[in-house]
Amino acid sequence: MTLAEIKVGQDAVLRTIGGQGELRHHLLDMGLTPGTEVTLRKVAPMGDPIEVELRGYELTLRLADAAKIEVDNVHETDRAARSETRHAPVPHPGVGELRKAASYHDRKAGREIAKGQPLRFALAGNQNCGKTTLFNQLTGSNQHVGNFPGVTVDRKDGTIRGHAEATVTDLPGIYSLSPYSSEEIVTRDFLLNTHPDGIINIVDATNIERNLYLTMQLMELGIPMVLALNMMDEVRANGGTIMVNELEELLGVPVVPISAAKNEGIDELVEHALHVARHREVPGRIDFCDATDGKDGAVHRCIHAVAHLIEDHAQRAGLPLRFAATKLVEGDQLIEAALQLDENETELLGHTIAELENETGLDREAALADMRFTFIERLCDKTVVRPGESREHKRSVAMDKVLTGKYTALPCFIGIMALVFWLTFGVIGAALSDLLTLGIDAVTNAADHALTAYGINPVVHSLVIDGIFAGVGSVLSFLPVIVTLFFFLSILEDTGYMARVAFVMDQLLRRVGLSGRSFVPMLIGFGCSVPAIMATRTLSSDRDRKMTILLTPFMSCSAKLPIYALFTTAFFPRQWRAVVMVGLYLTGIVCGILYALVLKLTRYKGEPVPFVMELPNYRFPSARSVGQLIWEKAKDFLQKAFTIIFVATVLIWFLQTFDTRLNVAAPDTSLLALIGSWVAPIFKPLGFGDWRVSTALITGFTAKESVVSTLTVLLGGDTAALSTMFTPFTAVVFLVFTLLYTPCVAAVAAAKRELGSAKAAAGVVVMQCGIAWVVAFVVHCIGTLLGFV
């Protein structure tokens, strides 16, 4: 019987883990080892993927992958009752409790690092364990935090507050040191090549069993290390505890209970980190095998034999011996290549591995994973007291019955997103935008009167009022709309709902050749294409990553909101504006789906990446996190308004004001009219062949908001004059074109970086412009046939 065949609510014991390659290794790293008990919790609304519970957390995987996992001892679940019996009243160790002397440490050879000398720390941990929150507390930084696996996709550096000599690098979250995706490679390469003075390993205390799997591998690196037990406040609130002193004695590293969200225990954590780094105190334990146990004893003998075999090679390659030995036993090809074993050594290694597999009855990868999780289980039995079920988990189960239910998931998603758009474009955002517009108009009028009274040169007066105030002011007026949208999206991400959306949408996206994990980068694309393109690094498949990058521009980014808001306000009554907005977003999604089908059948044939993802519990959104994201987006928008858009506005004003001989000219004889007239014929079949429109579209390549500022400048600040250039129907055609045409320069640069080719990035520009023209032309033709003009 396979895991795919058991029913919701049933327990089963894993017997064999089938499959091969990176996926199988990743499943083992996530705790799917032979002998592990799992519970099938739910099936996605479309029948695939499934969610299983194991080792205290929830994991998603597809039925096709579950069908490769054999199980036995299938029975109705009794996990909740069994967990309740483990609770015992144990005093909670207080934050800042004094420990025993750190005599269990090993001191590295060489002098201690004197106070004031530079120190570099790596902040490492699983995805979604609070790592970025801790980084912000340590450094005072404002990196984005979310309740979704894989928020950090690149390393970030900062200085520890109060310790100018100490820098810390926030590394992307990983589950093991056997890289499964590109962001995990960033973490592994940093640890192996940069050789930090210390590691701060953050562990989710509510999910300690899975988190310690990475801890064991970090300890094998032989780098001074301190373990930060995060979310201890949640553990205590639910009636559980972790016996910190016993845990650090058994592990051989300092263990500090903290709450990164509440800033508890951070000072003590910093003190321990500085101490172990300065005194070069490496973990006192790197051997986790029980030599007297059958399977563990075989693993123990194998690792020691391999370590003896490769000792000289590891030293030449600059690799920690224990780490290199365990990775070589696992079959890590990168480590094998770095060690450069000769033919005889390779043959001897093969014999040693074969002996391990014969004695344990497991393959090399499963044997190592089983050894680690066996040690963790014994460790947790001695140090962890779990409550029956946390309040967060109970709440998540209850909410998921509706939000991921078979018949309610999609209606809930559509309803939530419709509510967000209605509040953003029809109520809150629109009202605040109107108020800000009144304020900008008042400032503009005051400046106009002051310049007139001063008798300033008419050309300078035109530059300030018709150029800068009209262009930049028109873009600034849409700031409330963008802030409101990000407010709601940040709440949805912070709660953990976005991870559920990926779970619900996986089957749908698979039909167009993608994984549910691709949904999140594309959803980020509704905010900005640049971080969305960077977020594709969380996808382990090169095929999926490239496809997602190519599809991200179809998701309408927030930079286009000022264009939509300007045209919907000018041509549609208030009650229809949200409808038009939703229609535009849906058009982008539909076009993206159709393009994905084309890619799937042509350039990117093959299967999408497996959908293996941890589902976090729902959490109440952090006011600080939400406010931080809003501030970052508002700051980015303001910086763009007063840099790129400011320069574009001044340039447009200059080209509109002067002719080829630099004489002040009428707009229709200006340099801008000349340039626009060269491009205008391209757009004439679409119904907007005016040179001013084509000029605005050209400037939109620098930043989409420039379309609004350009049109405002060309219309002399009177946006009501748009009605002389467009009808409501041609306005819709124009909006469709701006929805789909080329991403901005920053997004193209991000695509070039991630695709690794300027040619590929140029292809994105040409492709988007071509698709935009064709779709807009089709809309124009259909509308004309229906009698619209």
Where do the protein language model's features map onto the residues?
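Extended, low-charge hydrophobic alpha-helical regions
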Residues: 359, 363-370, 386, 427-468, ...
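Juxtamembrane inter-helical linkers in multi-pass membrane proteins
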Residues: 438, 442-446, 499-529, 605-629, ...
